[in-house]
A protein has these predicted regions:
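Short-chain dehydrogenase/reductase
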Residues: 2-89
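Conserved acidic residues
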Residues: 92
Length: 96
């Protein structure tokens, strides 16, 4: 796997599942992770929110930016990408 230290990943659906697993793996290399997901409140049957994911990513060694995004709405995606680029100085990798 390439070195992801200092790289910025924008990951949709990173609050749980495969998205979170990818984020935590990249965080171990020191990556910056923008967590783009809808989950801000705990679900009764599914673990994780964008905030708990951010904690896990930072515990793994990365930097996290939790963003409330519903990918069905282009304006929300564009706003989140703009926020990510401003916060981390750009976006290197997009995972949807």
């Amino acid at each position: 796997m390439p070195d992801l230290s200092g790289k910025t990943l924008f990951i949709s659906g990173a609050s749980r599942g495969i998205g979170l697993a990818i984020a935590k793996r990249a965080a171990r290399d020191g990556a910056n992770i923008a967590i783009a997901a809808k989950t801000t409140e705990p679900h009764p049957r599914l673990p994780g929110t964008i905030y708990t994911a951010a904690e896990e990513i930072e515990s793994a060694g990365g930097k996290a930016l939790p963003l409330i995004v519903d990918v069905r709405f282009e304006d929300q995606v564009q706003k989140a990408m703009d926020q990510t680029a401003e916060y981390f100085g750009g976006i290197d990798i997009l995972i949807n």
